[in-house]
Amino acid sequence: MPNIKIFSGSSHQDLSQKIADRLGLELGKVVTKKFSNQETCVEIGESVRGEDVYIVQSGCGEINDNLMELLIMINACKIASASRVTAVIPCFPYARQDKKDKSRAPISAKLVANMLSVAGADHIITMDLHASQIQGFFDIPVDNLYAEPAVLKWIRENISEWRNCTIVSPDAGGAKRVTSIADRLNVDFALIHKERKKANEVDRMVLVGDVKDRVAILVDDMADTCGTICHAADKLLSAGATRVYAILTHGIFSGPVISRINNACFEAVVVTNTIPQEDKMKHCSKIQVIDISMILAEAIRRTHNGESVSYLFSHVPL
């Protein structure tokens, strides 16, 4: 693929390498380091003049440092005369701060959008934004890809009783997501209504739907401390579900999440690799990973060639 360069930030080099391999490319040379005062320094190690540049950096790990690193990499490529700079952000940082839900609350997702644009990004590729309206925070093109086709493929290949399952949303906000998956599998859906008083603390859960004598599959875009989905799993089991799975696009997994998952009644907690999971998997055999590198790689190929990416909304590329 001529006139294209792919660079990796520090957050998820394994995913970046998989994307490059699928495109038959080498990752571009870049050196990132910190000065003694903790300022980030980036050195692009090869010419990008006239190139179509893609920088892969996920919003995970040391989020603030990685975001700053991404901004500097974008700007470094832009002022080095790259023809176009696309930020490939599998898990978009600050996506949960997408609205003014109380007095004096910041809309930090909008701030991040502004920062990316000012740094010089011409295009954004991301996956399963926590709130789809974040696309409207940008004045540049944003392709919000979906993990749904890969999730459907995993369910059909790994859950033998998938025809006798119920797709469950752990909250009312995810109803659209689970109904889409349930419709494509031609199965029922349910949701759990939760009343929350404090952050990450669930006081009461009400199941709306039937899971008796069925496999229950909890689906959500992300999980952080996993308090909600672990309580939801208990609720589903007590309502008669035979087995419970959780499938999540972004496994943030912070705090005491490993012990919670190990002690929960899940058959498996399945996440995509928008965030690195290797260390977590060493301590929790229930965590399984769906590789989405082929989706991001195909989105990059289609973008570079001026083709539509809408095919990826319903298909997993080979």
Swiss-Prot record:
Record-level GO cellular component terms: cytoplasm; ribose phosphate diphosphokinase complex
Cofactor requirement: Mg(2+)
Keywords from the named record: ATP-binding, Kinase, Magnesium, Metal-binding, Nucleotide biosynthesis, Nucleotide-binding, Transferase
The EC number(s) this enzyme carries: 2.7.6.1
Binding, Mg(2+): D128, H130, D139, D143
A GO BP annotation: ribonucleoside monophosphate biosynthetic process
Catalytic reactions of this protein: D-ribose 5-phosphate + ATP = 5-phospho-alpha-D-ribose 1-diphosphate + AMP + H(+)
InterPro entries: PRib_PP_synth_CS, Pribosyltran_N, PRibTrfase_dom, PRTase-like, Rib-P_diPkinase, Rib-P_diPkinase_bac
Gene Ontology MF annotations: ATP binding; kinase activity; magnesium ion binding; protein homodimerization activity; ribose phosphate diphosphokinase activity
Pathway terms, separated by semicolons: Metabolic intermediate biosynthesis; 5-phospho-alpha-D-ribose 1-diphosphate biosynthesis; 5-phospho-alpha-D-ribose 1-diphosphate from D-ribose 5-phosphate (route I): step 1/1
Regulation: Activated by magnesium and inorganic phosphate.
Keyword Ribosomal protein annotated: no
Domain of life: Eukaryota
Region described as Binding of phosphoribosylpyrophosphate: spans on this chain: 212-227
Residue sites binding ATP per the record: R96, Q97, D98, K99, K100, D101, H130
Quaternary structure and partners: Homodimer. The active form is probably a hexamer composed of 3 homodimers.
NCBIfam families: PRK01259.1, ribP_PPkin
Family as reported in the entry's similarity comment: Belongs to the ribose-phosphate pyrophosphokinase family.
Function noted in UniProt: Catalyzes the synthesis of phosphoribosylpyrophosphate (PRPP) that is essential for nucleotide synthesis.
Protein name in UniProt: Ribose-phosphate pyrophosphokinase 1
Source organism of the structure: Macaca fascicularis
Lineage of source species: Eukaryota, Metazoa, Chordata, Craniata, Vertebrata
Gene: PRPS1
